[in-house]
Amino acid sequence: MGVDLSDKAIKSAKQLSKETSSNTTFICCDIYDLPRYLDQRFDIVFTSYGTIGWLPDLNKWAEIISRFLKPNGQFVFVEFHPVVWMFDDNFEKIDYRYFNSGAIIESESGTYADKNADITQEYVMWNHGLSEVVNNIVKNGLEINSLNEYDYSPYDCFNKTKEFEPRKYRIEHLDDKIPMVYSIVAKKKNNS
């Protein structure tokens, strides 16, 4: 089962599923609306890069995760570190607060998948500190098994990056001085 707000992402996922002969279902919807489209529980819920920055309400997000996990089910989460989102695009100065203080409205050329794409768009994002993420997960009946931070990104998706090992990127002038990614593994409590 895969869920995404982007119809293009769903189309791409369906194509990959077809190419790999995977029997997978996909739902295109706002994650907050998922209970309207799905009534099933899972052993694992996995959420990856670039997801929560689009969401204003992490309590609602964590409620959704908990709702769709079976008791003792595992939540696996990997995301760009909130420290990364504090910087300007070139990582030269701090432009934003670490903590969520409301919507950030920006205009950007290119896309996160193709920095050179001939497109300019306005978007709305939210910064979420680690305590906001962890506390909402715990508040919604999950127990944190691990929280890890990494000083690199597996993707070359930021300005001024350098690959220091295969598929490991850092901001060139910051080297290993900032966290770039974090991961959380949590388990839904048996009684929630």
Name every feature range the model reports, one short phrase each.
Residues 1-34:
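Class I SAM-dependent methyltransferase SAM/SAH-binding core
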Residues 36-45:
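A short acidic, Gly/Pro-enriched loop at the edge of an enzyme's catalytic core
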Residues 47-49, 78:
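Residues lining the SAM
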Residues 59-74:
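A short glycine-rich, Lys/Arg-flanked "PGG" loop and its adjoining helix->strand segment in the class I
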Residues 74-111:
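Conserved class I S-adenosyl-L-methionine
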Residues 82-90, 117-132:
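Acceptor-substrate binding/catalytic loop of class I
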Residues 123-147:
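Short alpha-helix
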Residues 140-142, 167-192:
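Core SAM-dependent methyltransferase catalytic element
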